[in-house]
């Protein structure tokens, strides 16, 4: 997985969306990140570790290529605005889900 800066992440995410426009999917995950690079041991906890500030870890993949970035709390507003504009521009190919009516469900149950 490639850890990128915020601006580079947004440009690579745009490329992923363009590549998967006709067929394919892009999966995006967002989670809290405390700065650790190694997993926490099961039996004991590391008591001396204190995160300096709150951070978010964003990951994106198309199944083949993975990209990620870490956004600090200081730059989250700027990143969120650019990220939301990118999502609005690239999520135009979504299809509405077919919802079955209640009457069809009740007929099938009888």
Swiss-Prot record:
One GO cellular component, as annotated: signal recognition particle, endoplasmic reticulum targeting
Annotated localization: Cytoplasm
Keyword Manganese: no
Matches recorded under SUPFAM superfamilies: Signal recognition particle alu RNA binding heterodimer, SRP9/14
Pfam families for this protein: SRP14 (PF02290)
GO molecular function term, any single one: 7S RNA binding
Keyword annotations of the record: Cytoplasm, Phosphoprotein, Ribonucleoprotein, RNA-binding, Signal recognition particle
Superkingdom to which the source organism belongs: Eukaryota
InterPro entries the UniProt entry points to: Signal_recog_particle_SRP14, Signal_recog_particle_SRP9/14
Ranges of Basic residues composition bias in the record: 96-110
GO BP term (any one): SRP-dependent cotranslational protein targeting to membrane
Main location: cytoplasm
Region annotated Disordered, chain positions: 90-110
Residues bearing the modification Phosphoserine: 45
Chain's role: Component of the signal recognition particle (SRP) complex, a ribonucleoprotein complex that mediates the cotranslational targeting of secretory and membrane proteins to the endoplasmic reticulum (ER). SRP9 together with SRP14 and the Alu portion of the SRP RNA, constitutes the elongation arrest domain of SRP. The complex of SRP9 and SRP14 is required for SRP RNA binding.
Family: Belongs to the SRP14 family.
Description of how the protein assembles with itself and partners: Heterodimer with SRP9; binds RNA as heterodimer. Component of a signal recognition particle (SRP) complex that consists of a 7SL RNA molecule of 300 nucleotides and six protein subunits: SRP72, SRP68, SRP54, SRP19, SRP14 and SRP9.
The name this protein goes by in its record: Signal recognition particle 14 kDa protein
Species per Swiss-Prot/TrEMBL record: Bos taurus (Bovine)
Name of the coding gene: SRP14
């Amino acid at each position: 997985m490639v850890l990128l800066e915020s601006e580079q992440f947004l440009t690579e995410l745009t490329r992923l969306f363009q590549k998967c426009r006709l067929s394919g999917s892009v999966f995006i995950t967002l989670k809290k990140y405390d700065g650790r690079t190694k997993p926490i041991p099961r039996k004991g906890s590391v008591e001396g570790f204190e995160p300096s500030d709150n951070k978010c870890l964003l990951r994106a993949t198309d199944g083949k290529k993975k990209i990620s970035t870490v956004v600090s709390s200081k730059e989250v507003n700027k990143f969120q605005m650019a990220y939301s504009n990118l999502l609005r521009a690239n999520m135009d190919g979504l299809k509405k889900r077919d919802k079955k009516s209640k009457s069809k469900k009740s007929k099938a149950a009888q």
